[in-house]
Amino acid sequence: MMNADHVEHVRAVLRESAEVKLRAAELCTEEIARGAELLAQAYAAKKKAIVFGNGGSAADAQHFVAELVGRFVHNRAALPALCLTANPSTVTCIANDFGYEELFARQLDAYAEPGDVAVGISTSGKSESVLRAFARARELGCVTIGLTGRDGGGMPALCDVCVVVPSDATARIQETHITILHLWCEAIEARLFGMISR
């Protein structure tokens, strides 16, 4: 027999997750829409997305890149995108030789071109490797888009667009981030290819 406390906990967590998304719908829609616009504009100009984050945010970055290069809903042309945590040899080389804080900035030196979009993900907005990457991306002429939560940390000052999810709970922030990344995929497919997901 299922423990009633466990069932109620599941219900409470699902409601909490939904409530964070509802708050984001009230507070973050302009930034989310602007992020979609900047990504679509970059792809229309034959630029690429370079995506990065640590831990769970690295997984979100990899997920986003997979849906850009592969597909989200519709079969369409592949879109150029790189995830800066996907190559273990590169990650460990840079972390060992230059320090972990330089992990993403060093790769931007190698890959980024003016007009590319640097998308950084950090639930706290305080990850030094992400902040350094945004500073380097700006020096290199990239558009900068951030996904964060809590009070945004140092990210809003370094981003052309920064979506600050209205929550202090890491898991709830991450759940909202993946929804936003899916919204961006949907918007890109609609604007570039006329493919509507609904």
Outline where the language-model segments fall.
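Generic N-terminal amphipathic, Lys/Arg-enriched alpha-helix
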Residues: 1-27
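Residue-level recognition of alpha-helical structural elements
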Residues: 6, 28-32, 57, 138
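Glycine/serine-rich anion-binding loops at beta->alpha junctions
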Residues: 48-65
